[in-house]
Amino acid sequence: MGKIIGIDLGTTNSCVAVLDGDKPRVIENAEGERTTPSVIAYTDGETLVGQPAKRQAVTNPQNTLFAIKRLIGRRFEDEEVQRDIKIMPYKIVKADNGDAWVEAKGQKMAAPQVSAEVLKKMKKTAEDFLGEPVTAAVITVPAYFNDAQRQATKDAGRIAGLEVKRIINEPTAAALAYGLDKQGGDRTIAVYDLGGGTFDISIIEIDEVEGEKTFEVLSTNGDTHLGGEDFDNRMINYLVDEFKKDQGIDLRNDPLAMQRLKEAAEKAKIELSSAQQTDVNLPYITADATGPKHMNIKVTRAKLEALVEDLVQRSLEPLKVALADADLSVNDITDVILVGGQTRMPMVQKKVAEFFGKEPRKDVNPDEAVAVGAAVQGGVLAGEVKDVLLLDVTPLSLGIETMGGVMTKLIEKNTTIPTKANQVFSTAEDNQSAVTIHVLQGERKQAMYNKSLGQFNLEGINPAPRGMPQIEVIFDLDADGILHVSAKDKQTGKEQKITIQASGGLSDAEIEKMVQEAEANKEADKKFEELATARNQADQMIHATRKQITEAGEALPADEKAKIETAINELETAKKGEDKAEIDAKVQALMAAAQKLMEIAQQQAQAQGANAGQSSAKEDDVVDAEFEEVNDDKK
């Protein structure tokens, strides 16, 4: 069996790792970096991923997609999506099924389809390192992701050509990376994970019994729409407002300026983690009738902290809930681990330290720990890692809607997965022949305030007074945290089963279509690359031939020169087209036309060689004089 790689599919950056022998190793990408920006750009005839996509964002803001993880598995009408629509430079659109999709280059795409481009880059990075095809992966998700978001992440893996062996929670993966090589004793750790777009807290117990380590998640909580992107947006809004005060121009209407501002804001935020003050200096940010305008604004660390204080505070509430759910106090926590790039901010570290009453560990790389943990889990599933048992939990309660619009829970939040639960329900009316099973996820008593995961009908129930039929509903939650539901009429034995797919989400047919499109794009990308290579060869050939014509001078007969010029012009024309075979043919034609020129160039080279030989021979004829010292007294 091939390697199972571990992928941290992040909002801002992604990372891939693999077990190298018995040690997990983070793999550098083609640009030599250990993390890859989760940025995808669509240009004319090409899809760019990572740093190349990020570099051209300023000139192509509408077709450069970032922070797509904030949309994955979400409905267009979601409050969070509506907030993002106002601040994203690219178009977020409503799909036919009500999901939030994006539009680039006039094409509508599902979030999993776009995320698949990042996963493909991770897959290729691993394949280049391993020297063999990779088909299986463990992909991480925020612990607080719901069923639809987990399913959408699995879909992205499938579209990228990966069999997703396991979906694992990010804090759990970080705990695996941290706890695997720690010796001795049981410990209870808190993993505070503040990434680019999501926030999680997990309380995890690591037990060691006779050499076997058990990682048991006691509780988890979080906010799937809180992260570094929100911190960036606070900085962007501040800079825009300051510029408007100073110059009277609102940059929000200028996508190009906003893209430059986004980069500058992120850079300033990062600099303020180590410096007390930084300058945001953007010349020619915009222009009006009076001429070009420049931005030069000083930002202090204190100002940034004031801008984001409520965001940091917002992350502390889930900590209290997670501790209460685990039935623990802060004194029971042995180690605090920080994960996610945003935890490099001193204010975040200070607030977390104050909350837990202890300094967070500094021996965990916040950008790489999650991918490393995913690679370890890949090793566990492949049988390469023994003596490790991982017990994860479901972040939210699962149940069905019952009479009066009430949610009746079948599986409580923080239940260890995989798990199974069943409950017998009945009909609400006399002679009811069908029941609708409406599956929900969330903590509210009122069904309407919880996330609807989908619904299905169980039909063919025998007529009977209400309350008589016995309908058994079974919830089966797998190790990926994805739910399978069945309902059975105990009298007739009729059964209906579904794997939960929300009213949104991608159907198998849509995923298959996207897989095929990805394959077709692979072929198109290959053709594009071959065409680019052919054009480069044509350019080199034209340049070399023109250079030789100049060097040959009068030695090249006029008719030969005319023949070559015609061949060059034909190659120039072919080079502008899309036909590689035509370019190759015209390259051959130019080589044939330049035959005489090649001969002249060769003769000239030989003549030069001969001249050089003669001059060195002349130098060889010079005899070194022999000096003899003569004493004066011998004169």
From Swiss-Prot:
Compositional bias annotation for Acidic residues: 621-635
PROSITE patterns: HSP70_1, HSP70_2, HSP70_3
Cellular component aspect of the GO annotation: cytosol
UniProt-listed Gene3D superfamilies: 1.20.1270.10, 3.30.420.40, Actin, Chain A, domain 4, Substrate Binding Domain Of DNAk, Chain A, domain 1
Molecular function in Gene Ontology: ATP binding; ATP hydrolysis activity; ATP-dependent protein folding chaperone; heat shock protein binding; protein folding chaperone; unfolded protein binding
Location of the region described as Disordered in the Swiss-Prot/TrEMBL record: 601-635
Residue numbers carrying Phosphothreonine: 198
Pfam families reported in the protein's UniProt record: HSP70
Name of the protein in question: Chaperone protein DnaK
Annotated source species: Vibrio cholerae serotype O1 (strain ATCC 39315 / El Tor Inaba N16961)
Native organism taxonomy: Bacteria, Pseudomonadati, Pseudomonadota, Gammaproteobacteria, Vibrionales
Gene name, Swiss-Prot/TrEMBL: dnaK
